[in-house]
Each structure stands twice: as C-alpha cells, then as structure tokens.
Amino acid sequence: MVSLRPLTASDIPRIVELNDAASPAVPITSPQEMAELLDLAGFTFAAVDGDEVQGFLIGMTPGSSYASENYRFFDQRGKEYLYIDRIVIDQTVRGAGIGRTLYTAVFDLARAQGRTEVDCEVNIQPPNPQSLAFHARMGFARVGEQETKGGTVEVALLAAPVPR
C-alpha cells in the first residue's frame, strides 16, 4: 500500500531514474534540472511504499515563472487551476492505482484551495495512448493542442473540472 508525502531533495536521484525510464512520455531530466523544477513547483507528491518512491507528481500553481510552453498555455487562460507538469509511475507497479491516488490528491488540493480545474498535457506525437485513456477516465477533456520543443513534440492540452 502506498502513502503520499511531498518530494524532497533526497528523492532527486530516484525520481530522475523513474523520470528518464519513462521517456519519451516525459523529457529526460538531469538531477540539476529536476532540482530546479522542484524549486519552482507549487506542489509535489511522492507515492512511497516503505522507503521506496514508486511514483511522483510535480505541479505548478498560477503565476509561476516556470517557462514551459504548456504551462504558459494554461496560465494565460485566466482560470483558477492547478497544473500537473509531470507524473511518473515505476513501470513495475503500473496499473496498481498509484496514478489515480496521485491525481485524487491533486483534485483534493485543488478543491481545498478553491480551484475550478486541474490542467495537464499528454503527448500525441510521439503518441501516448495509455496516458490519454487514463486522463479520459479521470474526467479530462481536450481544450487545445500545440507543438513544442521546436515542433518535435505535439501535445493534447487537457483540463478537468474540480468536483465540489
């Protein structure tokens, strides 16, 4: 059974390992880049089983200086939102409900903060059909598409209302 806690700097080696194993669904990230991302994050969750991080989620709140093209799309919409920058689950435990547990925590946080939606993006080129299906089950709908990383990646921009 996993429990959730905030990510810490001591988690960086493990989350970089998980992150890079999930490429191309998420970009390869150096330990320094991951530390910078954690510094910018508005919220984080580590899904842990004992001492082992099995998955993680990094998110942003409105008004961050985060330079991501996808984050900027949502920040410019003028909504009260939380943005999920990345979620990664250890490949050996996918399908065990960890993703749903992490997303439930984000929706609970959004509700507690009075937010109206949760936003994220999923690659459509290169394709990530499992993630698109997961997000559809979680209530996300496509609100846009855009090319990023110099046209090498195309994403579906997704939003889900926060249940009251």
Question: Residue locations for each model-derived region?
Answer:
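Glycine-rich phosphate/pyrophosphate-binding loop shared by adenosine-nucleotide-utilizing enzymes
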Residues: 2, 52-56, 82
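A short beta-loop-alpha structural element at the N-terminal edge
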Residues: 2-15
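Active-site rim helix/loop that mediates acceptor-substrate recognition in acyltransferases
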Residues: 24-50, 58, 64
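Conserved acyl-donor/pantetheine-binding loop and adjacent beta-alpha core of acyl/acetyltransferases
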Residues: 58-86, 150
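C-terminal "cap" of GNAT-fold acetyltransferases
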Residues: 76, 145-164
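Conserved acetyl-CoA-binding loop-helix of GNAT-fold acetyltransferases
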Residues: 89, 95-108, 137
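Conserved active-site alpha-helix within GNAT-family acetyltransferase domains
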Residues: 100, 124-144
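Conserved GNAT acetyl-CoA-binding A-motif
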Residues: 110-124
